[in-house]
Amino acid sequence: MRGVVWNGKIDVTEDLEARAPGTNEVRVRIAAAGVCHSDVSVIDGTIPFPTPLVMGHEGAGVVEEVGSSVTKVKPGDHVVLVTLGHCGQCDACESGFPTHCRDTFGKTSQPFTYKGEPAFMFANTSVFAEHTVVKESQAVVIDPAVPLAAASLIGCGVLTGAGAVWNRAKVGRGDTVAVFGVGGIGLNAVQAAWIAGAVRIVAVDANAAKESLARDFGATDFVDARATDAVAAIKEILPDGVDHSFECVGHPAVLRQAIDILGWGGNCVIIGVPPPATEASFRVAALTHIDRGILGSRYGSARPHVDVPIVIDLYRQGRFKLDELVTRTYPLDEVETVFSDMAEGKVARGVLIP
C-alpha cells in the first residue's frame, strides 16, 4: 500500500503494509487525513519519535475488518480516528478522563512493515497511509452523510482546540477570551468559545491575513502580533483583561503574553507544544495577587465518544464549521507541499487524500 514514512527524510512509498487487526483492533481504509503542526514537529525533532515512522495522526475512513472481540464498530462504518488508545478499564477511564489513562502516553507499536522491516506508528494512528490498524476505542462511528475530509479534522485539531475551551477552561456565557495563534487548533478554540457564549473573543496572530478567517469563525476582534504589542492591544479592547486565554503557539514568549493579559481570576490554558525541555518564566505575584491560574490541556481533555458526537451534531445544525477548515485537499505525493503551505500560513488545514 501507499503511505508517507519519515526515516530521516520524507518517503512517499508503495513499499508499506499494515497487518491484520488483533482481537480488540480494527483495520481502517483511510479516506482523508488532516495535516497538523504536530506532524511537522516529528520532522524537526520537537516531538522525538523512533523511526522508521508512518506519519499522520488526524484522519477518518471506513472500517474494513475488525478483531474477534470488537463489538462497537463493524465493517462499512464511517469512523473518526482519535489518538487516545485508552484502555477503558483503569480508574481514569472509568471516571471519564481518558486523557489521564496511562496507556495513552509514551508507548510505541509497530503494526506496519516498511521495505520488509517493522515500522513505528505515530500517535497511535498513522493516517498518512491507505490503511491503518487502531484499537476499537480509537474508532468513533459517525453519520456516513458527513464528508470524510471534514470529519478527518475532528480527531486532533477540533478535539484539541474545542475541548480546551469546553472541557478544560469551561468557558461560559458572557466570558471574555483571547486565543493566541489561529491556525487549525486556534480556529477551533475560537469557534468553540463562540458556541459557548463568550461575549468577546480576541484572536491574536502574527499573520494579518488570518483576520478574515478568524472573524468568520467567531472572533470579535483581531490583533496583529507582528505589528503591535499584543498585550497592550488587547488591554485597549478589554482594559480589565480576559477571563480565559489560550496559548496555541508553543512559544514561551507567547505564553507570557497569554498570562499577562488575564483579568482577575482568569485562567491561561496551554495548548501549544514546544520542545520537551522548554522552560517558561512568569512573575509569581501575577498569579497569586489576583487569583490567576495556568492549566495544561492534553488533547482538549477530550472524551472522544462523547465529544465527537457533540461536534457532529453541532456541524449538522450548521453551528460548527468543519468544511470551512479544509482549505485544500492534496494527494499523498504532495505532502511536502502541504507542509510548505502550512508554514506560509496559506491553509487553515490541508487534507491529504491517500
Predicted regions and their residues:
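Glycine-rich phosphate-binding loop and adjacent beta-alpha segment
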Residues: 251-319, 354
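Conserved beta-strand positions in the Rossmann-like core of class I SAM-dependent methyltransferases
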Residues: 64, 201-202, 269
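Glycine-rich beta-strand-centered segment in the early N-terminal region that forms part
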Residues: 19-33, 43-94, 99, 138-146
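Cysteine-cluster motifs in flexible loop/terminal segments that predominantly coordinate metals
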Residues: 82-137
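Mid-domain Rossmann-like dinucleotide-binding core that forms the NAD(H)/NADP(H) cofactor-binding site
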Residues: 130, 137-138, 143-228, 232
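C-terminal hydrophobic helical "lid"/dimerization subdomain
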Residues: 1, 240, 256-260, 305-354
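A short acidic, Gly/Pro-enriched loop at the edge of an enzyme's catalytic core
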Residues: 233-243
